[in-house]
Amino acid sequence: MKVGVIMGGISSEREISLKSGKSIVDSINKNKYEVVSIVIDEKEDIINKVKGIDFALLALHGQFGEDGTVQSVLQTLEIPYSGCGPLSSSMCMDKDISKCILKAANIRTAPWINLRRNDKINYEKIEGMGYPVVVKPTHGGSSVATFIIKEEKDIKNAVTEAFKWDSEVIIEKFIKGDEITCPVFGDKMLPVVAIKPKAEFFDFTAKYADGGSDEFVTELPKELHEEVEEMALATYKALKCEVYSRVDMIVTEDKVPYILEVNTLPGMTPNSLIPKSAAGVNISFSELIDMIIDESIKVIR
């Protein structure tokens, strides 16, 4: 089978995507697959460069990659691909839509408001949520242009900066606690990974720089583990995810978990969280790639 590892793209996460793609190409079982690297530099490449491949292994992140656009093109071209379909990809990429769905499904997530470019900032609603709040692009990823704001006077500048990256901005209550990530593969949760950033929160540098944070498989207390697992699987189902996704949460000091967001194409760099989780149950990176391909092929699109 000829597998095209699709990487690069046109989003702010291009460099991370290239790292993910290279890691996959380096680690994939070349005795089992004929592997080609496909670097996307412009949108047309997703049509022109995929000719002749039997399967698209997606290592794209951010817009035009993780938002369902590429998945729709590949489906139109009848090329099987890895991970979630167009609908779940686009819903998870839109933090406002995904939080609306979680709220409707009675899955705990922080209070928020969403702004379009011409909307007035509703300071009363923000005050009602209570400071600090997090300001970030609604469709962004990797914590690009994400700010923790502690006072009303700093809101406007943060919103202005976030709008440089997106047409919508989300402002949500900052939940203080420990960040964990819960990879879900099919209908099962892989081991929980704890994230201990060395900065104030898990920002771009902490995510992708060596030593930016400590990340390790962790064993939660039984009751908390059961609640986290139930929430992760319910979130995966509510957002119609397929094959695999990474559900990120914050757990407060009182052991109350909140859903942060869902990543449908999580990073696959040497620092990435899903390979660390899989290693916790003795699944190598190469085996994980195999599993993703095998499960993706089974999905009827």
Swiss-Prot record:
Belongs to the D-alanine--D-alanine ligase family. Pathway: Cell wall biogenesis; peptidoglycan biosynthesis. Its EC number is 6.3.2.4. It comes from Clostridium botulinum (strain Eklund 17B / Type B). GO terms for cellular component: cytoplasm. It holds the Pfam family Dala_Dala_lig_N. Mg(2+) 1 binds at D248, E261. SUPFAM superfamilies: Glutathione synthetase ATP-binding domain-like (SSF56059), PreATP-grasp domain (SSF52440). HAMAP family: Dala_Dala_lig. It comes from the Bacteria. It is found in: Cytoplasm. NCBIfam families: D_ala_D_alaTIGR (TIGR01205), PRK01372.1 (NF002378). Residues 99-294 form the ATP-grasp domain. Its cofactor is Mg(2+); Mn(2+). It catalyses: 2 D-alanine + ATP = D-alanyl-D-alanine + ADP + phosphate + H(+). Its main location: cytoplasm. This is D-alanine--D-alanine ligase. SMART domains: GARS_A.
